[in-house]
Amino acid sequence: MAKRTPSIDTKNLTAVQLMELDACVRCGECVKWCPTYAASGGKPGLAPRDKILRWRQYMNKSYGLKAKLFGPQEVSPSELEEFKDDVHGCTTCGVCATVCEAGINTVEIWEAIRTNLVKKGIGPYGKQSAFPKLVGQYHNPYMKDQKDRLAWVPPDVKIEDKADIVYFTGCTAGYNQLALAFATSRVLNKLGIKFAMLGEEEWCCGSALIRTGQVHVDDVARELARHNVEALQKKGAKKVLFACAGCFRAAKIDWPRLLGKELPFEVIHITQFLADLIQADKIKWEKPINKTITYHDPCHLGRHVGVFNAPRYVLSHIPGVKFVEMDRSKEFQRCCGAGGGVKAGMPDLAVAMGESRVKDALETNADILSSACPFCKRNLSDGRDALKSDIVVEDIIELVAEALGLSTS
């Protein structure tokens, strides 16, 4: 009698990741910190520890001693479907990795498992499955015309055809959250920074595909990275600026992995760029912002890349600003809820997480909740609205523009 085929396989999981899965000691520290678990009201399947233990159980059924002696035990399709839902209910924020006593790199594991399941036809979740087709066809996830990439640019903004510095706008700022694009471009002009943009040659960074386990689908993610790098080189880029934390993370970490080589230019977040200018005394403020401001660390900018100080340095140097920290900040911040495809796949869960983060901000009595990512701004605003709060949600670059006397509309 032929042995049953294993229900799962180990593809996309490295030897190190397999050892990390085995290293979990079930202490539960990650459960205390997980924002999706908390926002769900304590749904056991969303707890990081539970996901690791379940996958380990599936591995034992497929490849353990009993499986080798008597053949693999089946993991039912319904069980794998439920697991798929739970593993996609994670924003990949990385706080579980931060607090893990065993040092498990959970973000890499979640993305590897998602990819593994998608390759087997299990997942992704809901609307997430449309990402490869949309981005592959339109080169952005919003089905917008690429010719409109620079349609937002106002007459007062000067853009070079080629320059050492290129501003990578991102799909969300370029199409949906224009205030961030207005603010970034006008701030650069005000500071005398000559910069270029890619226009219709700017394609999606690919973050949504990678985060949702679809990095391999039709090789779209790799093609996006290749095209963007080549387009940036043609513009003469030596330094590429990002005001979107998701795009920044994709360029900084994912593009080199996809292409198998280092990038031929420096990638830097706008807060790092501004912090350097402030330190060099090259910014002359024109208008004080007499408000109390707190700051939310985008997961992709903070825990994923390690940029914590630059945003705070910028905020603390804006005249009139009283800066206050939330209890959970920097490495231990609470995710806004927008990442990992959750905003698209599970919007109600995303907003519930946004509400939790806004409550953290309200405890500081801040007038303004700031961040440095359009996705964070969107979901924090949704959380604020759900709470019927009057706290203002603004991106750091908008605040910088205001303090320089510039319009963001």
Swiss-Prot record:
Keywords: 4Fe-4S, Iron, Iron-sulfur, Metal-binding, Methanogenesis, Oxidoreductase, Repeat. Binds 2 [4Fe-4S] clusters per subunit. Pathway: Cofactor metabolism; coenzyme M-coenzyme B heterodisulfide reduction; coenzyme B and coenzyme M from coenzyme M-coenzyme B heterodisulfide: step 1/1. [4Fe-4S] cluster 1 binds at residues 24, 27, 30, 100. Its EC number is 1.8.98.1. GO terms for biological process: methanogenesis. Its cofactor is [4Fe-4S] cluster. InterPro entries: 4Fe4S_Fe-S-bd, 4Fe4S_Fe_S_CS, Cys_rich_dom, HdrB/HdrD_reductase, Helical_ferredxn. It holds the Pfam family CCG. [4Fe-4S] cluster 2 binds at residues 34, 90, 93, 96. It catalyses: methanophenazine + coenzyme B + coenzyme M = dihydromethanophenazine + coenzyme M-coenzyme B heterodisulfide. GO terms for molecular function: 4 iron, 4 sulfur cluster binding; CoB--CoM heterodisulfide reductase activity; metal ion binding. Transmembrane segments: none annotated. The keyword Repeat applies. Residues 14-44, 81-110 form the 4Fe-4S ferredoxin-type domain. It comes from the Archaea. Belongs to the HdrD family. The dihydromethanophenazine:CoB--CoM heterodisulfide reductase is composed of two subunits; HdrD and HdrE. Part of a complex that catalyzes the reversible reduction of CoM-S-S-CoB to the thiol-coenzymes H-S-CoM (coenzyme M) and H-S-CoB (coenzyme B). This is Dihydromethanophenazine:CoB--CoM heterodisulfide reductase subunit D. It comes from Methanosarcina barkeri (strain Fusaro / DSM 804).
